[in-house]
Amino acid sequence: MSKKSGLSFLWLSAVAFVVDLLTKYIVVQKFDLYESVNVLPVFNLTYVRNYGAAFSFLADHSGWQQYFFILLALAISGMLVYFLAKNNAEQKIQNSAYALIIGGALANMVDRAYNGFVVDFFDFYWDIYHYPVFNIADIAICIGAGLLALDAFKSEKKKVQDKQVEKCGQK
């Protein structure tokens, strides 16, 4: 009997993908560019266009970066799907991380390929200092990266514990 692979976590990619594109669609339909609605004293919904990557990285270049980011999203997503296929479904943290990164990367890629930019709208600030505006796909990618770090930490801790148990058994 073969064990279930990590591919069963791709539903999480689909959820991140659909929720991101749906929220971007709503923002584009309901907001004018740069329109901002105050939600909390430290949070606005603000429609902006990001022509670069995270934190508008490479946004001021001549347009080649759009193709670079599309290829990068496809390459990373392909690699992570391969990792999911190789993983056992019981590796829940790592599989969830990969799936969230895939969903976020592909959603931003579709937005970039269709529009030539990525729609961002979550705007957190304090006084006059604004954090870079971001979207659901960015959140999915960041949560995925955080889960990978957590998984690596847990795996390293388990290795240390296993070595300690092994040493105790040799005495």
From Swiss-Prot:
Gene Ontology terms: biological process: proteolysis
Pfam families (alphabetical): Peptidase_A8 (PF01252)
PANTHER family: LIPOPROTEIN SIGNAL PEPTIDASE
One GO cellular component term: plasma membrane
Protein name: Lipoprotein signal peptidase
UniProt keywords, alphabetically: Aspartyl protease, Cell inner membrane, Cell membrane, Hydrolase, Membrane, Protease, Transmembrane, Transmembrane helix
Stretches that traverse the bilayer: 8-28, 64-84, 99-119, 133-153
Record bears the keyword Cell inner membrane: yes
EC number: 3.4.23.36
Cellular compartment(s): Cell inner membrane
Pathway where it operates: Protein modification; lipoprotein biosynthesis (signal peptide cleavage)
Residue runs in coiled coils: none
Active-site positions on this chain: D120, D138
Membrane topology field: Multi-pass membrane protein
Organism name: Haemophilus influenzae (strain PittGG)
Function summary: This protein specifically catalyzes the removal of signal peptides from prolipoproteins.
MF terms in GO: aspartic-type endopeptidase activity
Entry's family note: Belongs to the peptidase A8 family.
Catalytic reaction annotation: Release of signal peptides from bacterial membrane prolipoproteins. Hydrolyzes -Xaa-Yaa-Zaa-|-(S,diacylglyceryl)Cys-, in which Xaa is hydrophobic (preferably Leu), and Yaa (Ala or Ser) and Zaa (Gly or Ala) have small, neutral side chains
Cell inner membrane keyword on record: yes
